Amino acid sequence: MPKMKTKSGAAKRFKVRASGGIKRSQAFKRHILTKKTTKSKRQLRGMTGVHAADEKLIRAMLPYA
């Protein structure tokens, strides 16, 4: 049986935690930031968890993570 390929786009966007959960970075933080408040930009910092409904699909894209 051949090796499964990791989706390279998913590998760049998601990281698997030691506990087994998947984390992702926040959207809406790349450009057009002048009209966003300091509070909204601060709340978009850091990583957040992936929704349970999406987790199965992401795990299929990252077979060796």
Curated annotation (Swiss-Prot):
Keywords attached to this Swiss-Prot or TrEMBL record, sorted alphabetically, are: Ribonucleoprotein, Ribosomal protein
Molecular function as annotated in GO: structural constituent of ribosome
Choose one Gene Ontology CC annotation of this protein and give it.
Answer: cytosolic large ribosomal subunit
The record ties this protein, via SUPFAM superfamilies, to: L35p-like (SSF143034)
BP-aspect Gene Ontology terms: translation
Cross-referenced InterPro entries: Ribosomal_bL35 (IPR001706), Ribosomal_bL35-like (IPR021137), Ribosomal_bL35_CS (IPR018265), Ribosomal_bL35_sf (IPR037229)
UniProt keyword annotation of Ribonucleoprotein present: yes
User: Could you confirm whether the keyword Transferase appears in this record?
Assistant: no
Q: Which family does it belong to?
A: Belongs to the bacterial ribosomal protein bL35 family.
Q: What is this protein called?
A: Large ribosomal subunit protein bL35
Gene responsible for this protein = rpmI
